[in-house]
């Protein structure tokens, strides 16, 4: 698209090339830009970059005195709505599905927020929950497939959390520009539940990757979402089938944002699909972990009870408690990418063990550590 914008500014010499390029663009846009404005890659950063390119092309056509195709204007309008939905409380983007957050100034330069209308609750397979101090963003759809999946991540039901306009729980922020391994596209590099050392989708390797690119294969195909809204509360219930074949378990995640109490209550469960079956692994006891990737500007420390975790940014007066009823809780080293460069970070790891016939359930809660709360 950027090259097409340059062609539009080249005068008569580029007219034939421009006409051909615009015709191909009109064919590609309905496939690339979904009806709700999301990019086919399901990457928020990809939607932003395409919006920049299409705006540049539109401006170049204006300078030529040529009207933009209706499909281009429609794509700009849809992408603007999606980027407005993706813009979080700190002015940057979610770091999911192969894209970094960007800066507040960079995201604002796209002009997507100019309408002033409130963002919708869901777009492009994501759910957004906005409270007084807390903001929750959750990946609620399967990753892209085929050629669109070169940057996709197999991280079902991953969440990002902001508190008081600051990032608290994040993703690893892996992107194609990151100097990090492809393994960071897997489930245990995100804020969600994983089983043993298994993956529910992974990138191609070796000859196939050299031929087709590091496409994601073997990923989960079904994510179910149910959302309920009431005065002072938001509830999103999700599940995915990524563990069914191997372990006979469905992962269910429940997120309840209590706006009045200014707290988030979460629940992660492994539920047997068939109590008589154990999946291909044939395990009776299934170890699992629930990870919360902590943003590098936030410190995590265990309380005396050995389970509760205090999450606190340097400029935060009080911090936030992450309480849970897991079998154990630990703080481990992790990595976070910013502008493609690795930063040392922490992750909270909740451990448990599910029985093949009955599953398991872990409850957790994020609440303010300010005096009189929590």
Where would I find each of the regions flagged by the language model?
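Polysaccharide-binding surfaces and accessory modules of carbohydrate-active proteins
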Residues: 279-334
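Catalytic and substrate-binding regions of extracellular carbohydrate-active enzymes
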Residues: 108-299
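Beta-strand-rich recognition/accessory modules
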Residues: 323-374
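Generic recognition of long tandem-repeat/solenoid scaffolds
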Residues: 127-129, 234-240, 302-314, 322, ...
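Secondary-structure transition/turn motif
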Residues: 239-244, 269-274, 312-318, 325-327, ...
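Carbohydrate-active enzyme catalytic cores, enriched for enzymes
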Residues: 34-174, 345
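Secondary-structure transition/capping motifs at alpha-helix termini
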Residues: 12-13, 63-64, 275
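Active-site lining segments of carbohydrate-active enzymes
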Residues: 1-45, 49
């Amino acid at each position: 698209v950027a090259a097409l914008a340059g062609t539009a500014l080249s005068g008569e010499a580029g007219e034939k090339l421009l006409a051909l390029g615009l015709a191909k663009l009109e064919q590609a846009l309905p496939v690339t830009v979904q009806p709700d404005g999301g990019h086919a890659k399901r990457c928020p950063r990809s939607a932003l970059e395409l919006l920049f390119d299409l705006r540049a092309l539109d401006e170049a056509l204006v300078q030529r005195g040529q009207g933009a195709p209706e499909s281009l204007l429609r794509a700009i309008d849809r992408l603007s709505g999606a980027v407005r939905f993706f813009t979080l409380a700190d002015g940057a983007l979610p770091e999911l599905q192969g894209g970094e957050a960007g800066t507040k100034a960079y995201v604002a330069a796209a002009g997507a927020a100019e309408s002033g209308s409130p963002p919708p609750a869901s777009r492009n397979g994501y759910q957004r929950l906005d409270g007084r101090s807390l903001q929750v963003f959750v990946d609620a759809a399967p990753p892209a497939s085929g050629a669109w999946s070169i940057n996709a991540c197999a991280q079902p039901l991953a969440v990002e959390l902001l508190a008081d306009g600051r990032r608290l729980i994040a993703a690893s922020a892996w992107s194609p520009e990151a100097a990090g391994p492809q393994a960071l596209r897997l489930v245990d590099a995100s804020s969600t539940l994983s089983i043993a050392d298994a993956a529910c989708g992974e990138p191609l390797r070796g000859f196939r990757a050299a031929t087709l690119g590091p496409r994601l294969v073997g990923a989960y195909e079904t994510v179910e979402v149910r959302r309920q809204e009431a005065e002072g509360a938001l509830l999103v219930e999700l599940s995915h089938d990524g563990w069914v074949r191997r372990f006979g378990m469905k992962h269910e995640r429940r997120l309840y944002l209590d706006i009045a109490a200014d707290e988030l209550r979460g629940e992660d469960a492994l539920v047997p699909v068939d109590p008589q079956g154990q999946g291909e692994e044939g395990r009776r006891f299934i170890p699992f972990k629930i990870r919360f990737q902590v943003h590098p500007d936030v410190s995590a420390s265990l309380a005396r009870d050995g389970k509760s975790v205090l999450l606190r940014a340097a400029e935060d007066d009080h911090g936030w408690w992450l309480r849970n009823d897991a079998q154990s809780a630990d703080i481990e080293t992790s990595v976070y990418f910013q502008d493609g460069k690795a930063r040392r970070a922490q992750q909270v790891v909740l451990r448990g063990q599910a029985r093949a016939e009955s599953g398991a359930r872990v409850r957790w809660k994020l609440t303010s550590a300010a005096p009189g709360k929590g």
